[in-house]
């Protein structure tokens, strides 16, 4: 089949290559002319035969919205737009309505696999009607990993991005658990080779995972992570997961704590701990540490 692909960055560029390897035609557009096959969205749409499928792989928020707005003016009834970026699931219904007014279908798709997806395949979670999903199915089949799993029609519009959001929330908590265990192992004198402890966990243990494999890769590059500063950003999906939990009264202690740990990583000197130190000094005369004057 033919596919229009908008956004050819680290993920989009590799996805184009994987789909082409499966025998499909992909026409890609990107603001970077060095990687684009066409010079505009209008040219991309003009090169596709109907009914068209256009996959949007651009940053969530304004970039996705402006792309969908433009496609709504260019596409025809019966065409389908797939949002494969990390959009907030609450935006999906709005996009479906905007496109649906013009008879254009919409499918939201959460994509996991990162830079490894070209060779290993991408895990796909998508939401939309059976009719619209069927039009995209050959592309889903090309992108997914080999085997029976790694791809799911999660439900109606919004379900794909919601599932990907929860996936990323779980990822936050798993990374935090590995990080806490690593720090504790590094702290004690009795464990002399933390890297090899992590490596030993890769086979036969209940905590083996791809994230653990990546942790071992990182420790092979920098055994004690001395080259890194302990600063961790968050992409937004961890926050959205916690907000969804609050909206649905679902307790998420591990995921929430892992998000807050990232906030703490960005503070060189915690204002909260200053207040705690001051209060302990006030009520109990406990010692405090003063800032060193320069």
What function would you assign to each model-found segment?
Residues 67-69, 88-185:
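Rossmann-fold dinucleotide-binding core
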Residues 31-94, 100, 118-128:
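Rossmann-like NAD(P)-binding element
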Residues 6, 29, 57, 83-85, ...:
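Structural motif
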Residues 1-52, 78, 115-117, 281:
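NAD(P)+-binding Rossmann beta1-loop-alpha1 motif at the extreme N-terminus of oxidoreductases
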Residues 26, 106-107, 252:
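Hydrophobic beta-strand scaffold residues
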Residues 125, 135, 158-286:
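Helical "substrate-binding/catalytic lid" subdomain
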Residues 22, 102, 248:
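Conserved dinucleotide-binding and phosphotransfer motif residues
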């Amino acid at each position: 089949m033919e596919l229009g692909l908008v956004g050819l960055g680290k993920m989009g560029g590799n996805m184009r290559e994987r789909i082409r390897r499966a025998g499909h035609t992909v026409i890609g557009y990107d603001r970077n002319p060095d990687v684009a096959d066409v010079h505009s969205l209008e040219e991309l749409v003009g090169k596709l035969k109907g009914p068209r499928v256009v996959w949007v792989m651009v940053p969530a928020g304004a970039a996705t919205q402006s792309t969908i707005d433009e496609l709504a003016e260019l596409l025809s009834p019966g065409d389908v737009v797939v949002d494969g970026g990390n959009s907030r699931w609450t935006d999906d219904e709005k996009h479906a309505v905007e496109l649906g007014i013009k008879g254009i279908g919409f499918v939201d798709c959460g994509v996991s696999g990162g830079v490894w997806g070209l060779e290993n395949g991408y895990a796909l979670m998508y939401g939309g009607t059976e009719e619209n999903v069927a039009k995209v199915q050959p592309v889903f089949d090309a992108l997914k990993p080999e085997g029976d799993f790694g791809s799911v029609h999660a439900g109606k519009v919004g379900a794909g991005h919601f599932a990907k959001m929860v996936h990323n929330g779980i990822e936050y908590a798993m990374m935090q658990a590995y990080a806490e265990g690593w720090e504790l192992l590094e702290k004690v004198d009795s464990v002399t080779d933390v890297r090899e402890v992590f490596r030993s966990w890769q086979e036969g243990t209940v905590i083996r995972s791809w994230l653990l494999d990546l942790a071992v890769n990182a420790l092979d590059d920098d055994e004690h992570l001395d080259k890194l500063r302990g600063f961790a950003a968050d992409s937004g999906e961890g926050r959205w997961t916690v907000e969804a939990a609050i909206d649905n009264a679902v307790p998420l202690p591990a995921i929430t704590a892992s998000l807050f740990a990232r906030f703490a990583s960005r503070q060189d000197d915690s204002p909260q701990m200053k207040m705690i130190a001051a209060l302990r000094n006030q009520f109990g005369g406990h010692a405090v540490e003063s800032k060193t004057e320069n």
